[in-house]
Structure formats: structure tokens, C-alpha cells
Amino acid sequence: YNVLVVDNAENLNDPFAYPPAELVFPPGEEFWHVDVKWNYNVPFDFKQVTDPELTARLHDIAKKLYQVMGVSGYGRCDIRMNEKGELYILEINPNGGIMFKPEEYGPADYMILYDPEGYKGFFERIFRAAVVRQKMRAAA
């Protein structure tokens, strides 16, 4: 699973989490290795996580990771689930790629587009939070 988290200008202690994405592996694959990730001839896709309970769990762990690691702006959290339903953090990428060509979309692109505000909303969230952070620095 992937969860994109961005700063929330209204409350920097409560970041905004986008609808999570689940990687749909091509037949015969169980791991997102270099050929799956970068060979555009290997068919894979992402689908939006729609289960409310799983979404809440993914959001909770991703937002906590974002805060604990001191990320600002945005970060993409990579999380996996075992057969018992336990979630495991792989990483948080504080500068995950975005705005790839549609045929090469990465997980962050899908999550941004799951949100009705799309890229415009994504960048507005980041810019508004940056202004808040700058005002806080200036006041210190």
C-alpha cells in the first residue's frame, strides 16, 4: 500500500492523508522490483483502497510516520500487510516522484487524482503550509 501525506496549513500537527493506493501486481509477480517499477512494458496498476477500516489504519500509520520523521511538504509512505492483516512500514519517501506522464503514473499521481482537488489541491496544500511555516519562523 501507499499513502501520500501532505502538510495541513490549518494544523501542522495533523497532516492531510490522501486516499491510499494498492499496487496490483502483474501475473507471477509478488514484489515491486526494478523491472516492475521501471519497465513500462510490465503491466501493473494501482487501485484505490475503499475499505474504510483499512483506509483509517493506513492513514493513522502514515500520518504518524510523517510526523515522527519530521517530514514537511509531502511524503509517500510505503506500507505492506501480511496474511494476518498486520501492517509494516517499508519507508517514507520525502520527495516521491509526481506528475509523470499518464502512461507512467506512479503511486503518488494516482492518490492525488483520487482526490477531487487533484494536482491543484495538492500544490495549494503545500504552498499554504509553507506560508504558515515561514510566518512562524519570522515570528520566532
Feature map (PLM): residue ranges:
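Phosphate-binding site of ATP-dependent enzymes
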Residues: 1-53, 57-60, 81-88
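ATP-dependent carboxylate activation and anion-phosphoryl transfer catalytic cores
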Residues: 12, 49-140
